[in-house]
Amino acid sequence: MILATTKIEDFDRFWNAFSTKGAEKRRQHGSKGAHVFRDPNEDDRVWVVFDWDEEGWQNFISDPEVPAIFQEGGLQGTPKAAEFVRPHDA
């Protein structure tokens, strides 16, 4: 799992790119799905939980075609992944 966050210009613009070109590119890098959340305190921030491994995430972020998709989606910078600390059973 990968938890990532970024700021966006407009949610509809973000969603249009995320759910089309972004989804296709993520799939190419092994993503199995995502859950998108809007931040309750910052209207211009989204959080996404990806069903993805670290290698796939890094390959996606370094793909030379991805910045254009981010720009189309109105992202304000490259998404940042939270550091995974450890799992817990409850």
Task: Identify the role of each PLM range.
Residues 1-8, 34-63:
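Short, well-ordered beta-strand segments in beta-rich or mixed alpha/beta enzyme
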Residues 11-33, 64-70:
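Short amphipathic alpha-helical segments
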Residues 16-19, 23, 42, 55-57, ...:
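Short linear sequence elements within intrinsically disordered, low-complexity coil regions
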Residues 29-46, 69-90:
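Glycine-rich beta-strand-turn "strand-cap" elements at beta-sheet edges
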